[in-house]
């Protein structure tokens, strides 16, 4: 990114309408400067200050065997500031303060060898949710952002070519594979064959229980669910469920 309000990078894209998702594996990426961004992106327009949701990784040149983080960057308003990893955000705690969702390092590299990292970025309404995975099967939620965008937007691959402040013409590159873009979805309803859960198996006494549903590619999560505590079906006010992100929180005093 050129600065917080103006984008300047390489973007390969296509136009999509309404709900959509992009899934891909980042096979490899070069690192020519600190915090070079590589990943997938939804944009409302091709203007430099467009509203944006971008899922990717930030590499650190001095320690390029691993990623510093896999994170969800966003620009909520046209020509507003983008929440992006930079030199001043040098820890997960600082990223959290800046409102940047991230996950700890995945196994993108083993020494000099690339293992690759999978990305899944989903738009459902005005909610954009990012997931990352080592194998493309078991997904970790990176985070979600609510961004009001038009019905027709762009989706594609974003690579910050970047360049260190020297005379060398050395630019960043990236290789993607296993690319899938979906614009049509099948509702899962109660067909559990297309749903997986992640999160803790239990909660400590007196604390809320949290977990998450993830739908297979090309499927939408159900609009509503029922949860049992013991033999009883909980009333909806006893738990929260977000059909756009799959997040479930059961209140501690309703657990048995």
Predicted features and spans:
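Small-residue (G/S/T/A) turn/hinge positions that recur once per unit in extracellular repeat modules
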Residues: 192-200
